[in-house]
Amino acid sequence: MEIKYLLTVFLVLLIVSDHCQAFPFSLIPHAIGGLISAIKGRRKRDLDGQIDRSRNFRKRDAELEELLSKLPIY
């Protein structure tokens, strides 16, 4: 093999091994944060916020439909 192919293969292997080594260590903080939020019950509060946003969206949609129905037809 020529040296440029060997260098290319070496660099690809170096990049892949670096990503594989960093992968488990990036999962640890996310797992800890998920456990803490599950213990504190943040998910429940987030769902309540999503429900409120959904209600507000439906209310705005109904108001928009009412406004459009009142506009004259051109």
From Swiss-Prot:
Lysine amide: modified positions: K40
Residue ranges annotated as propeptide in the record: 46-74
Localization annotation: Secreted; Target cell membrane
Keyword list, A-Z: Amidation, Antibiotic, Antimicrobial, Cleavage on pair of basic residues, Cytolysis, Hemolysis, Membrane, Secreted, Signal, Target cell membrane, Target membrane, Transmembrane
Taxonomy of the source species: Eukaryota, Metazoa, Ecdysozoa, Arthropoda, Chelicerata
Bilayer-crossing regions: none
Secretion signal span: 1-22
A cellular-component GO term for this protein: other organism cell membrane
The protein's name: Antimicrobial peptide 2
Function per UniProt: Has antibacterial activity against the Gram-positive bacteria S.aureus (MIC=48 uM), the Gram-negative bacteria E.coli (MIC=120 uM), and the yeast C.albicans (MIC=64 uM). Causes hemolysis on horse erythrocytes.
GO terms of biological process kind: defense response to bacterium; killing of cells of another organism
Main subcellular location: secreted
UniProt keyword Cytoplasm, yes or no: no
Domain of life: Eukaryota
Family of the protein in this entry: Belongs to the non-disulfide-bridged peptide (NDBP) superfamily. Short antimicrobial peptide (group 4) family.
Expression tissues: Expressed by the venom gland.
